[in-house]
Amino acid sequence: MQHPDSILTLLKKSEEFLKKKEIPSARLDAEILLADLLNLQRVKLYVNFERLLNETEKNAYRERILERSKNKPTAYITSQKAFYNSIFFVNENVLIPRPETEELVEKVLSDFKGNIGEQNVLDLCTGSGCIGISLKLARKDWNITLSDISKEALEVATKNAIQILGEEKHIQFLESDLFLSIPKESKFNLIVTNPPYIPISDKAEMMKDVIDYEPHLALFLENPKDFLSTLIAQAYERLVEGGKLYMEILPSLSETIISDSIAKGWENGKIEKDLSGKERFVILTR
């Protein structure tokens, strides 16, 4: 019989509790929260499953499980999220990085293989900085600018740049509503963005952990099509000839965005599907 304070027993009890609260992936969340608390890899929980937690550890774990039972995302409880081979600090001022955005980073790096030299790159609506910082890690010779309308989001991005890249000076940070505060003389070879694109009318269909905790400024729009059209038009003016815009978008808007953009002077455009088969990405060339 397992001791009531052992790792294995506490995991089982936590899983049962979270399931009763209708939390998806209850077991996984229970493991992540405990492994992070004990500073262990998840697999090490089972190597040490007979280990007993002390009173302080038990209380801290109980508090974490209670937070998760109220739909608080695991990433906000642990203050971190893995993204493209790095661990990013996150809080409720930034969107939690998604696997689809990792795919966006991968597409950029795949398209820009080889020694193409120095590139000026803008990560627009940067949030945690996960896109721009991941690109900088892979391509040291790229000049990266991170911009966001939210001062609090830029503070998170700055913290991540320091922790992951070693020195803040590797990247430029700009607080800006789209391109409004970005110097007009600044021209970019590449703009990458995961902007807000979910219609506010779809809000009720979202999971409670998203609605209750993630920043609505980074998610929802009254009119995504108009917002994205404005973004695309402004991006055109800031790209060099032959420059590219990579966007994560609402799949239902992909065809419209491509046709409208070509009609307004973009050289070409293409749609890329994510791993689930949705038309998630638009790539435009000036």
UniProtKB/Swiss-Prot annotation:
It holds the Pfam family MTS. Substrate binds at residues 194-197. It catalyses: L-glutaminyl-[peptide chain release factor] + S-adenosyl-L-methionine = N(5)-methyl-L-glutaminyl-[peptide chain release factor] + S-adenosyl-L-homocysteine + H(+). One of its GO terms (molecular function) is nucleic acid binding. Coiled coil: none annotated. Its EC number is 2.1.1.297. Methylates the class 1 translation termination release factors RF1/PrfA and RF2/PrfB on the glutamine residue of the universally conserved GGQ motif. HAMAP family: RF_methyltr_PrmC. Belongs to the protein N5-glutamine methyltransferase family. PrmC subfamily. This is Release factor glutamine methyltransferase. The gene is prmC.
